[in-house]
Amino acid sequence: MNSLLMITACFFLIGTVWAKEGYLVNKSTGCKYGCLLLGKNEGCDKECKAKNQGGSYGYCYAFGCWCEGLPESTPTYPLPNKSCSKK
């Protein structure tokens, strides 16, 4: 019984330690933040680490800014009920 309790506690802790990751999204258009220089990208890293995003690291992946270490409150692509509109 104690083993089951310990395993459950470990799964709970792992879930709270892992941070969110994903493509940065423009809330008004629903589109990903674009980039051209794949891999390490100063622009993506700066955007991800901005105060309003709260990420720990960003890089260019598949021509979009991918962020790691985001808080759960930061929206990522795709936004629910909003498709990318380039207007």
From Swiss-Prot:
UniProt entry tagged with the keyword Transmembrane: no
Disulfide-linked positions: C31-C84, C35-C60, C44-C65, C48-C67
Function: Beta toxins bind voltage-independently at site-4 of sodium channels (Nav) and shift the voltage of activation toward more negative potentials thereby affecting sodium channel activation and promoting spontaneous and repetitive firing. This toxin is lethal to crustaceans (freshwater crayfish (Cambarellus montezumae spp.)), it provokes a reversible paralysis to insects (crickets (Achaeta spp.)), but is not toxic to mice. At high concentrations, it does displace the (beta) mammal-specific toxin Cn2 from rat brain synaptosomes.
Entry domain remark: Has the structural arrangement of an alpha-helix connected to antiparallel beta-sheets by disulfide bonds (CS-alpha/beta).
Keywords: Cleavage on pair of basic residues, Disulfide bond, Ion channel impairing toxin, Neurotoxin, Secreted, Signal, Toxin, Voltage-gated sodium channel impairing toxin
Tissue specificity comment: Expressed by the venom gland.
Source species: Centruroides suffusus (Durango bark scorpion)
Family the entry assigns: Belongs to the long (4 C-C) scorpion toxin superfamily. Sodium channel inhibitor family. Beta subfamily.
Gene Ontology molecular function terms on file: sodium channel inhibitor activity; toxin activity
GO cellular component: extracellular region
Protein's cellular compartments: Secreted
Domain of life: Eukaryota
Signal peptide span: 1-19
Entry annotated with the keyword Cytoplasm: no
PROSITE patterns: LCN_CSAB (PS51863)
Protein's name in the database: Toxin Css39.8
Listed GO biological process terms: defense response
Location of the LCN-type CS-alpha/beta domain: 20-85
Main location class: secreted
InterPro entries from the UniProt entry: LCN-type_CS_alpha_beta_dom, Scorpion_toxin-like, Scorpion_toxin-like_sf, Scorpion_toxinL, Scorpion_toxinL/defensin
